[in-house]
Amino acid sequence: MLGLAEYYFPIFEEALDAECMPLELKYLPVIESALNPRAFSRAGACGLWQFMYSTGRMYKLEITSFVDERRDPVLSTKAAVRYLKDLYGTYEDWILVIAAYNCGPGNVNKAIRRSGGKKNYWDIYYNLPRETRGYVPAFIAANYVFSYYNCL
């Protein structure tokens, strides 16, 4: 995966930097797709950033029987950055943004309501879908591993 990181991370970093967003978000596709642009989930998510059809279309990715821009590293990265930026505009908390990226803003909003309006990830943890409860810690671990793999 480190070889793939050398190819894809500069694409991710350029797009994130252009929008003044945390460069650590480049690790999301590690969790989403293991940096495989052809990855396809059981739920129908596709590409490096694992866009669902509806989210991909919302962010202007062309998806037809001939073309699927969710698999295009540059176009899907630009769309993912716009989506992450929109989520940050809603939550103003990067951990909640990462959770919402995984399970959708509707599920995060429901978890916040069920937690009495608390907006701290760890306060809403048990009200999130099981997959998302593992997703955020996996993202944190990927950050650590990729940042310190030379020291291991």
Task: Describe each PLM feature range.
Residues 13, 28-29, 44, 48, ...:
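Catalytic cores of transferase enzymes with a strong primary signal for eukaryotic protein kinases
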Residues 21-38, 97-102:
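Short, functionally critical alpha-helical segments immediately adjacent to catalytic or ligand/cofactor-binding
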Residues 38-60:
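Short, surface-exposed glycine/acidic/tryptophan-bearing loops
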